[in-house]
C-alpha cells in the first residue's frame, strides 16, 4: 500500500517534533527506521519554532491577507521576523515592504507571546488583520490572557474550529487536530486517521496591525517531550556484535544479538551517531575505500544505554 521506512534522517542538535504526530526526537544524531507511509514526507520542527501560515489554497490569489496565522512550538526564548510585500513587483528593492517581529518566551509553565506592531508599508498592504495563534501543547492551559494595543481582551472558549473562526476573540482546545481534510470523498484514503498532538488555537479580532501590538499569556503550558520510542526498563548488556558479509568498498554491515529490555540500538562511526535502529543489523554507507574504521554498537532503553561494543572494520 505504499508503506515505507526511511533511514538516514539527520537531526541537528536540539529537540525535534514530528509535525504529523507530535512525537519528540533528540537531535545530534541520525535517526533510522522511521515510519513514513506513502502520504507522509518526514517533516521535523525544532522546538522553539515560530511558523507563519496561511489558509489552505491552490493559488496565491486565494490567500486571505486579512488574517494572519502563527503556529508555535514554545521552548525557551524564540524570535522571528515576518516579512511581507506586494508579491507581484520588485518595489521591495526600494523599501516597499513590511516586517513584524514575534517573540516567544517560555519560563517554567508560563508562556508569553508578543507580536509587535508591523513596520513599513507597500502598495495594497492589508493593515486591518485578524490574528490566529496556534500553540502546540500536551494539555489544556490553566489560563489565557490576551491584550491588543495594551488593552485586555476577553477570550471566549468555543468547542469547534468552525466556531473559533466565526467568533472574534475566542479560543479552542483541539485535542486531536486532523490533517486528513482534503482526501477524495469515498476513497480508502479518506478513512486514514492522521492526527497530531493537541493545540490551543486563539482567534483575535481584526485590528490595525501597524498601530496595535498583541500580547498573549498562557499559564499552565505543558508539552510532552519524552522519547516515544523509549518504553522498556532494566539493565542492558553490551551487545555481542560482529561484522556481516564480505568486505565492500563503500559499506560495512554490523550485526548483533537481540538484547532483552532494549528499545533500539545505536551505531557510532566517524563521530556520527546512527540511532533508533530496531533491527539487529545495520549497514553504514558512503564510506571511503581502503579505510579502517572503528564501529561501536550499544543498546538503549528509557533507563539509559549499555556499554559500547567496538568492532574493527575495513573497506576494500
Model-found features: residue ranges?
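Short acidic/polar inter-strand loop motif in beta-rich domains
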Residues: 220-226, 302-305
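Short beta-strand segments within Ig-like beta-sandwich modules, predominantly Fibronectin type-III
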Residues: 272-279
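Catalytic core of carbohydrate-active enzymes
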Residues: 1-151, 155-191, 195-216, 220-222
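Beta-strand-rich modules
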Residues: 284-303
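Exposed aromatic-hydrophobic patches
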Residues: 203-205, 281-287
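Pro/Thr/Ser/Gly-rich low-complexity, intrinsically disordered linker/stalk tracts
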Residues: 230-260, 289, 303-316
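Short beta-strand elements bearing conserved aromatic residues within extracellular beta-rich modules
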Residues: 144, 265-267
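Extracellular Ig-like/FN3 beta-sandwich strand-entry sites
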Residues: 211, 262, 290-292
